[in-house]
Every structure is written in structure tokens, then in C-alpha cells.
Design a protein with these regions (language model features):
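C-terminal motif of bacterial Sec signal peptides marking the signal peptidase cleavage site
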Residues: 13-16
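Extracytoplasmic electron-transfer domains, predominantly the class I c-type cytochrome c fold
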Residues: 36, 56-118
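Secretory-pathway extracellular proteins and peptide precursors enriched for disulfide-bonded cysteines
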Residues: 8-9, 35
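Sec-dependent signal peptide recognition
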Residues: 2-7
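Electrostatic cytochrome c docking/interface patches
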Residues: 18-39
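Short cysteine clusters
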Residues: 43-46
Length: 118
């Protein structure tokens, strides 16, 4: 009986493993608000972003953002780096074509959550 209980406990733990959701990757962030902010800041005018109108081709496609190894080809893709990049791309890569848009940290977290979810 103990063996069955132990196996059941392992199965439950294993079921919880794997890739996290966007909200677990960016705790406390709201992907739906991220979509609204992406539209507000006009991100789709330069980037192709799943579920966002525009489909610009100036910046890189952000489809499958969570699968990218690097952000802007420069920094490792992680939620913290994504938030920093969204807030201050010019500080990270001076002269990059992506402008500083005055995105606050909570807004950047929501935008990152949306990108990781799509």
C-alpha cells in the first residue's frame, strides 16, 4: 500500500513538471493586459506578434518568443531580461533601432507575460 501511495505521489509531482505558464514565468503579470499594452505602445507596427494586428517587419518576429535563445540577439532570453529590454532597450544595446517608449516595470511584466504565452 505504501508503494502505491509513493508511486501516486511521484505521478502527481511529475504531472506538475514541465514548462510553466506565462503567469508563472512572469509572476503577478497579466498577459491580457500585456496584449492591450502591446496595442497601446504600437509594438505590432514593427514586430509580428501572435494575436496582434499590424505585423510590422522592421523588428524581428516575436512569434514563439519563449523559444528564442536570445533577446535582440544579445542577451539570454529570460523573463527578467525581457522586462529589462522592454523597459530600456537603449541601455542594453545603445543605438538599437528599438526606442525607449517609457514602459513602466509593471507594464513590461505584462507585455513579457503576453509574449511568453504566445
Amino acid at each position: 500500500m505504501r508503494r502505491i501511495a509513493a508511486l501516486l505521489a511521484l505521478a502527481v509531482l511529475a504531472a506538475g513538471c514541465g514548462k510553466g505558464t506565462a503567469t508563472s514565468l512572469v509572476p503577478g503579470a497579466d498577459p491580457k493586459q500585456g496584449a492591450r499594452l502591446i496595442a497601446h505602445y504600437g509594438c505590432g507596427s514593427c514586430h509580428e506578434i501572435a494575436g496582434i494586428e499590424g505585423g510590422g517587419r522592421v523588428g524581428p518576429s516575436l512569434h514563439h518568443f519563449k523559444d528564442l535563445r536570445f533577446i535582440a540577439g544579445e542577451i539570454p532570453n529570460s523573463p527578467g531580461n525581457a522586462v529589462r529590454w522592454i523597459m530600456h532597450p537603449q541601455r542594453i544595446e545603445p543605438g538599437t533601432i528599438m526606442p525607449d517608449l517609457g514602459v513602466s516595470e509593471p507594464e513590461a511584466r505584462d507585455i513579457a507575460a503576453y509574449l511568453y504565452a504566445h
